[in-house]
Amino acid sequence: MKLIARLIIIFLFSITVNAREIGETEITSEDGIEVYQNEKFYLLKKNVKIESDNFTLIADNVKISFDKSLYDITELDANGNVDFNSKEFKIKGNGNFLNFKVKIEKIKVEGEGSQLITEDIEMFSDGFIEVSNLNGDFLLKGMNSKLINENIIIKAENINGNFTDKIDKKEITNLEVNDQDVSYVKNNDTEMYAKKINFNNETSVIELIDNVIIIRNEEKITGDYGTLDTRNNSYKIKS
């Protein structure tokens, strides 16, 4: 049920004039707010800014789902020039569209030039990027998808994997990469090309499938299938 205009005006006045205190959420928008109390969501229009203890969000338009109160945010859907930054969740990003499920810490950004950046991993795509912060799952899908961390660079249409938190950094534990043309992975001093590239941290082996190329120290080797052991830095290729 849409609330009456008077309540909307009072709500907007209270959140734009009063300074935000710890534990509060400050929300501003130029073209007002539409609240649907029964459905438990509200719409913010034009130059929206949301600032809380957990995150800051800027976008053209935002839909907010809530639980017990308007400030008890459970989910955000933001459209247009989206910029998101969370010090608590240690992640920031931008894109044309963003969905953020607050309680399960799952974030998805979409659109050309989308990016998500954590403490140790940078992700880019013209399709979409999705990260589940609690379990470490991530997925990049679309043109110009790329993942970068301290030891590895990955480029492919589809990058699917998982990372875990170590003492001082995030570590990639599983990885599945594929591309209709070719996937690219650079690990330290070795460059690898293949249609499909898989990695399992338990075995420390990178597996390369179809149209395989491995380049190291100006040496180039090709084949149909290859493996690289990251533990002892050795590799094998066969046709």
Each language-model region and where it sits:
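N-terminal amphipathic/hydrophobic interface segments
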Residues: N18-S239
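Hydrophobic h-region of N-terminal signal peptides that target proteins for export
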Residues: I10-N18
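Sec-dependent signal peptide recognition
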Residues: K2-I10
